[in-house]
Amino acid sequence: MQIRADFDSGNIQVIDASDPRRIRLAIRPDLASQHFQWFHFKVEGMAPATEHCFTLVNAGQSAYSHAWSGYQAVASYDGERWFRVPSQYDADGLHFQLEPEESEVRFAYFEPYSRERHARLVERALGIEGVERLAVGTSVQGRDIELLRVRRHPDSHLKLWVIAQQHPGEHMAEWFMEGLIERLQRPDDTEMQRLLEKADLYLVPNMNPDGAFHGNLRTNAAGQDLNRAWLEPSAERSPEVWFVQQEMKRHGVDLFLDIHGDEEIPHVFAAGCESNPGYTPRLERLEQRFREELMARGEFQIRHGYPRSAPGQANLALACNFVGQTYDCLAFTIEMPFKDHDDNPEPGTGWSGARSKRLGQDVLSTLAVLVDELR
C-alpha cells in the first residue's frame, strides 16, 4: 500500500502505514505559515472489502481544532464523485474508516477543485457571449489570476464583483464560481438578461492559485493570509490582492461578494459590513434585502453565522470590509460549510461541489432582483 500527495492540492505526511487498520498520518502546515487543516491524499494498493482505518494525529493542533467535531471526511474512487466516510474526533486525532470497493481511493477535507479544472472553466467562460479575459495578474510563484468581465449591453453601468478562494483550502468557493459561470451559458435566462442589461460582472474564480496547488489552508506561497492584506497589499507578499485592487480602482465597484468556506459552522451564511465606519441605513437595507431574497431560494439562512461586530470597529484588512468602506457599496462575505448544511442535510455527501454550484446560481438570481436598488 502506498500513500501519495505529490499532486495538485495534495497534503499529507505518512507516519506509519504498515497496518491497514492503524494508518497514522499528519497534515503538513501551509508554506511559510503554521496554519493547517486541509488534507488531500491518494491511497494505492488497498485491499478491497478490508476495513482501512486512518488517523490524522495532529488534528488537535490544527487551525480550527474545534471544527473536527461533527465533521466527516470525503473520499472518491475516481476524483469526480465524492462521498462522506464515517469520521470521529478525539484526543488522539481525527479518525476515519473505509472498507473500499476498489484498490485506489482519494481522501480530502473537501471536494477539491483542481487547477486543470480551473483552466477548463476559464476557457469555457471565454466562449460565452459577452465574456472576456479583462486582465491577468500574477501570483507570488507566477501563476495566472484571471479577471473575467461579463458585459452584454453597452449601456450597462453597474460593476458587480465576485472573487473566490482567497483562502486556498476553501475549494467550495471555486465550485460556487463554476455554477455562476455555467448559468451564464443559458441563452433564454430572463433573470440574467435583466441583470446584464444593467450591470457588468467582474469575476475572479481563484484568488490564490499558489496556495491551492500546494495544499494550503489559509495562505499564499509567501505565507500571507490574503483576506488580511486588503488595507496595505504588497506587490511582493500579496500580489494577488494588489492586482485586484488596481483593477477595482480602474473600473469601479457597485457590489462586492467574497466567496469562502467555514470550517466550524454547519450552515450557509453571510457576513456584512455593519462594523464599518461608513455603514449607513442604506447599506443596512440592502444587506437585509439581499439576505431575504437569497434565503427565499433554498440553502441560505440567517439564524447562524458570525457574531455582529461593534459599530465603527471593523477590521479593514478584510476584503469585504475594505471594499464596502472604500466604494460605499453592498459587500458580503459568503460562507459555505466544510461539514453539512444542517438546515438541509445530505448525509451521503454533506455540503458538496454540486451544492456550491447551485448556491452560485441562486446568488445571480438574487442580484437580478436587487440590481435596480444597488445605487
Walk through the language-model features, giving the residues of each:
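Extreme N-terminal flexible tails
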Residues: 1-101, 105
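Short, P/G- and charge-enriched loop/turn segments at secondary-structure junctions
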Residues: 28, 320-321
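Short helix/loop capping segments that flank catalytic or ligand/cofactor-binding pockets
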Residues: 35, 64-65, 108, 115-118, ...
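Short, Φ-rich (hydrophobic/aromatic) sequence segments
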Residues: 39-41, 122, 291-294, 363, ...
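A short beta-strand motif that forms part of the nucleic acid-binding face
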Residues: 58, 111, 164
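Extended acidic/polar, glycine-enriched regions
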Residues: 88-139
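Active-site/substrate-binding loop(s) of hydrolase catalytic cores
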Residues: 130-150, 155-315, 321, 326-349, ...
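His/Asp/Glu-rich mid-to-C-terminal helical/loop segments that flank catalytic regions of hydrolases
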Residues: 341-375
